[in-house]
A protein has these predicted regions:
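Long, charged, low-complexity intrinsically disordered regions
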Residues: 1-66
Length: 66
């Protein structure tokens, strides 16, 4: 089963903490749903890159960690 973090309705200021906690407390595979916001996608990928986590963009607005 894939763990999912849905960021719809979350504030940009909270994304760093939410994504960091999610990726550090769960094991792959995981999905992070960012929606249509390019800012949200950038915030998420910044956290993943900071932690050297490999990710793929499967659909616009969804990032997968395998």
């Amino acid at each position: 089963m894939i763990e999912e973090l849905d960021l719809h309705g979350e504030r940009h200021a909270d994304v760093d903490r939410l994504v960091e906690n999610f990726v550090l407390l769960n094991k792959p595979p995981m999905a992070i749903i960012c929606g249509n916001s390019s800012i949200m996608v950038k915030l998420v990928t910044d956290v993943l890159e900071r932690h050297n986590i490999e990710w793929e963009r499967w659909n616009y607005g969804t990032i997968k960690i395998l």
